[in-house]
Regions:
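Cleft-lining beta-strand/loop regions that shape enzyme active-site pockets
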Residues: 2-4, 135, 144-149, 158, ...
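Conserved P-loop NTPase
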Residues: 341-345, 352-384
């Protein structure tokens, strides 16, 4: 598998992969979500250094005068203002350092909490066809009750054709107040026709953890991202699998782009009794160290499935378990995002996400732009019978540990 396939890159950086009523423009990775009291603050001398803001203001006034005098179309002053701020941050050349408008920041907060008001689906947009497809339907959602299915292709929202629209605009059309409904028309390949559904908007918890028992005492647990509800869902899953007699755990982190640091630290801690989980270091050599406590949630053998789209927080979990020999890593080399972002509210409803530090695995290794190599390398192959060859290899590795 290509380590950074086009679909994944678009999902991580521009929000091609998004959940309805969450931030379509949110960039993933690993980050601290700070409270509104923790606003961005820089020393005065740093604010003034390097840039002549008087000259910049003068230049902007000239540009604005020229636009007002000559530009053919109407000007959205708010969009122009936001564009200035976004361009300023984008000039850093770091795709993970981002300015959020008030609306984007509100959506980001909903996204990172894992709870929001919406129809309860995750969608993706094909950049070549512009078609938007449902890829997940969350449990207990209005979408599930209405009968929306993964694989459905979205064509209309409230009788309005959306096949030429950007995914962000479509998300905005589907969003609404709790208890209200939206009419969605989808094409369903299995039935070869269009289906119209009235879907209620509800308070929804995103399903970031899925699990089931496999044969031979193997429990399967997939984490799709790390947000505010992930650890509680992970605990529920692990408890249920153990109650069913799980002897070995197959942990699937494939295509997991990352998320919140606090959540992945909690999960990693459940597999370790001591030692460093991850450490960080900023440009001044300062940082934090996160360590495991003595409590152990599962002491059986573990296989971890990863691929080139397993990034950031996923790599913290896989890296720690690998460094301590706590699990066998199976699959392909991970994405290689070894940096941490802080999100700073700016006091006016907007916010900025800034890359602030590198992170290191327990052995002191930086995996940034390198990734984590698996213990057992297995490229994904397309089997005619639909067999997941990577999953089968991980099961084989786990059975060897259990024997």
């Amino acid at each position: 598998m290509e380590r950074r396939d086009n679909r994944f890159a678009k999902g991580v950086l521009t929000g091609i992969l998004c959940s309805l009523a969450v931030a379509a423009a949110a960039t993933w990775g690993i980050y601290f979500l700070l409270t509104t009291r923790q606003k961005a603050a820089l020393p005065q001398e740093e604010q003034a250094a390097g840039l002549d803001y008087g000259e910049i203001e003068e230049k902007l006034e000239k540009l604005k005068t020229m636009v007002d005098a000559s530009y053919l179309y109407d000007v959205d002053e708010e969009s122009m203002r936001d564009g200035i701020y976004k361009g300023f941050i984008a000039s850093l050349g770091d795709p993970y350092t981002v300015y959020y408008t008030e609306e984007e920041y509100k959506e980001l907060q909903e996204s990172s909490s894992g709870e929001y008001v919406g129809v309860g689906v995750q969608i993706s947009q094909d950049p070549s066809t512009n078609l938007i497809t449902v890829i997940r339907v969350f449990r207990g959602s209005g979408a599930e009750e209405a009968g929306l299915l993964a694989g459905d292709v979205l064509y209309k929202v409230d009788d309005e054709d959306i096949t030429t629209e950007d995914i962000n605009n479509v998300v905005a059309k589907i969003r609404g107040d709790e208890g209200t409904t939206v009419k969605l028309e989808v094409y369903r390949e299995s039935s070869g026709g269009f289906v119209a559904l009235d879907v209620e908007r509800r308070s929804v918890s995103m399903d970031t953890v899925e699990w089931k028992m496999l044969e031979n005492g193997i429990g399967y647990l997939q984490i799709t991202e790390f947000d505010g509800v992930t650890y509680s869902q992970f605990t529920e899953a692990l408890t249920d699998l153990k109650s069913q007699g799980m002897k070995g755990l197959l942990l699937d982190l494939r295509d997991n782009p990352g998320g919140r640091l606090d959540q992945v630290v909690e999960i990693t801690d459940d597999f370790l009794t001591e030692g460093v989980i991850v450490s960080t270091k900023d440009k001044n050599g300062q940082g934090s160290t996160y360590e495991a406590d003595e409590e152990l949630a599962f002491d059986g053998p573990v296989s971890v499935l990863v691929n080139g789209n397993s990034a950031s927080a996923s790599e913290i979990l896989a890296g720690a378990l690998k460094d301590y020999g706590r699990a066998k890593i199976v699959g392909t080399t991970t994405f290689g995002k070894g940096i941490v972002q802080n999100i700073y509210p700016l006091g006016d409803g907007t916010a900025m996400k800034v890359t602030v530090s590198d992170y290191y695995t327990p052995n002191g290794t930086s995996i940034h732009k390198i990734g984590i190599d698996p213990d057992v390398a297995v490229e994904k192959s397309e089997e005619e019978d639909g067999t997941d060859n990577q999953l089968e290899k991980a099961k084989e590795v786990l059975l060897e540990e259990l024997s």
